[in-house]
Amino acid sequence: MKIAILSREPRNYSTRRLVEVAQARGHQVEVLDTLRCYMNIASHSPSIHYEGRELESYDAVIPRIGASITFYGTAVLRQFEMMNTMALNSSVAISRSRDKLRAMQLLSRHGIGLPITGYAHSTHDVPDLITMVGGAPLVVKLLEGTQGIGVVLCETHKAAESVIEAFIQTNNNILVQEYIREANGADIRCLVVNGKVVAAMRRQAQPGEFRSNLHRGGTAEAIKISPEERATAVQAAKIMGLDVAGVDILRSARGPLVLEVNSSPGLQGVEAASGKDVAGKIIEFLELKASRKNKPAE
């Protein structure tokens, strides 16, 4: 196959691994800087241009779109889809998962376990919002935040009021969530590919920190997940419409709780911790998806 990878970082571990595996399996791969792609949105002949040239057709596209460029990145991916290029994850599914509030509402609607979560517009509702999630300590999350940025643990009622009001008054959209004390600063990242958990790791926050993101100094180790955790991860990815996803789960007294469903999960931490060839599983699935698309109707 001829595969395009949309990535702003060609030297990034995840991008390099996908290129290496795809080439080793005989595919032709080109890494395209998402923000350098530009589009001709014509009725009968839509096209994508890159560095002054019109791109030829690709059999498949792998989107590695960072959260900060979701709007433009999904627009580029839609253009590939308009040109009948098969996407590893669809633009619709990526947009759905990137809207954290919408994602939480969809997961809630389907009965997926979640931390108690509140959302409000007015500072007048802050006291009730704090009560709604069980009081302090609680967690405040910027809807646009990634990699643990914009996530604040408020340990007292007064601190919670101050932080929430400050965010609202500066026109930031936030979620307010209960703090799951029994998780002890750890979460589980499950890598789901084609409806199966192909690898999992436990991420532990460093001492004095509650955010377990590896970008924030957290550590990772292999973990054996329970059947309930496995089913939760698979179902969460399915609800988002993602064929490849990183599902973040907290272990709580009432069972697994989903924190987030990531449409462009990093591979370095989970491959190192689990010893699994996740990039290989992704390319194998891409081949399977292509064969299904090209299979003639009986």
UniProtKB/Swiss-Prot annotation:
Which residues participate in Mn(2+) 1 binding?
A: 248, 260
Give the cofactor note text: Binds 2 magnesium or manganese ions per subunit.
Keyword field: ATP-binding, Ligase, Magnesium, Manganese, Metal-binding, Nucleotide-binding, Protein biosynthesis
Residues engaged in binding ATP:
141, 178-179, 187, 211-213
Q: Name the top EC class.
A: ligase
The answer to whether keyword Acetylation applies is: no
Indicate the segments forming the ATP-grasp domain, all copies.
104-287
Q: Which GO terms describe its molecular function?
A: ATP binding; metal ion binding; ribosomal S6-glutamic acid ligase activity
Family membership noted in the UniProt record: Belongs to the RimK family.
Its protein name is Probable alpha-L-glutamate ligase
Q: Which organism is it from?
A: Aeromonas salmonicida (strain A449)
Recall the taxonomic lineage recorded for the source organism. Bacteria, Pseudomonadati, Pseudomonadota, Gammaproteobacteria, Aeromonadales
Q: Encoded by which gene?
A: rimK
